[in-house]
Design a protein with these regions (language model features):
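Short hydrophobic core segments
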Residues: 2-13, 53, 73, 128-138, ...
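Glycine-rich dinucleotide-binding loop and its adjacent helix/turn
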Residues: 5-69
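Redox-cofactor binding/interface segments in oxidoreductases and associated redox assembly factors
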Residues: 8-9, 52, 122, 135, ...
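FAD-binding beta-loop-beta segment adjacent to the flavin cofactor pocket
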Residues: 14, 160-171, 236-251
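FAD-site-proximal beta/loop scaffold in flavoenzymes
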Residues: 24-45, 118-121, 127-202
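Rossmann-like dinucleotide-binding cores of NAD(P)H-dependent redox enzymes
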Residues: 49, 57-113, 195, 214-225
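Hydrophobic alpha-helical segments, especially N-terminal targeting/anchoring helices
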Residues: 76, 121, 159, 253-256
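Mid-to-C-terminal Rossmann-like scaffold of FAD/NAD(P)H-dependent oxidoreductases
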Residues: 176-258
């Protein structure tokens, strides 16, 4: 198909780490698309024991969504605490306590070493029997098309502030790209909705001959678990100002007077 300008918006896909015996698990799922959710929904029963590998946003939202429809939800994560990429130790502990009060079982600092059908052996030596497995350990950028075409690719497709790749007349936007993080000055994949649509708008404007760069991306999340709501934005390296009460925790980080 001939084109004058091309946009690559191939998004991301679930990352499934190598785990011994994974193929022996019959009911195993990712939790990223509507089709994933529907497939999971079809196998759940009130007697189901669900094992979720991954205590990030995707895994914990899955746990919240299915908890009262099944017999047990067990979450495991190799990281030392839940949500380590967006919360500090205090914030993680508050969210974990809230989830555990609702009935979600959480083990951190361990992950699955091997599967034997519906039996999992963890790296800690613990074991877990389950009926349904959900793997939710993160996503990876879909960069294969751009890479095969010869574009510069790191963890994501490398683009400028208007979505231009290293290839002439080829643009990219969204979860498949790397973005400059205004808050930290680093460049990395920022797989969040606001970044995706603002990148897409900038690329579309450039493809139409206009100039509307997007160069102020900031990692941000607004989410809740069982009525405990949280908002995070930016990076956390700097002077900390903390306000904490029994059911409230606020932290403001200042760096270079900002």
């Amino acid at each position: 198909i001939p084109y004058d300008r091309l946009l690559i918006a191939t998004g991301s896909r679930p990352f499934v780490p190598p785990m011994e015996g994974l193929s022996t698990v019959k009911n195993r799922f990712s939790f990223m698309t509507l089709d994933d959710a529907r497939a999971l929904d079809r196998v759940l029963t009130p007697q189901s024991r669900v094992l979720i590998v991954g205590a990030g946003l995707i895994g914990l939202k899955c746990a919240e969504g299915i908890l009262h429809r099944v017999a047990k939800v067990q979450v495991v994560d190799l990281a030392p605490r839940i949500l380590p990429s967006i919360l500090d130790e205090t914030g993680s502990a508050m969210v974990q306590e809230s989830l555990e009060k609702q009935g979600v079982s959480i083990l951190t600092g361990t992950t699955v070493e091997r599967f034997d059908g519906n039996h999992a052996t963890l790296t800690s030596g613990d074991t877990c029997d389950f009926d349904v497995l959900v793997v939710a350990v993160g996503v990876r950028a879909n960069t294969e098309l751009a890479k095969e075409a010869g574009a510069l690719v790191g963890r994501g497709i490398q683009v400028d502030s208007e979505g231009r790749t290293s290839l002439p007349d080829v643009f990219a936007a969204g979860d498949c790209t790397e973005t400059r993080d205004l808050s930290s000055g680093t460049t990395h994949v920022m797989a969040i909705l606001p970044n995706a649509y603002l990148q897409g708008e900038a690329a579309g404007q450039a493809m139409a001959g206009h100039h509307a760069p997007f160069d102020n991306a900031i990692p941000m999340n607004a989410i809740g678990f069982f009525h405990l709501h949280m908002v995070t934005a930016g990076s956390y390296d700097g002077q900390e100002l903390v306000w904490q009460e029994k059911a409230s925790y606020k932290k403001l980080v200042i760096r270079d007077g900002k």
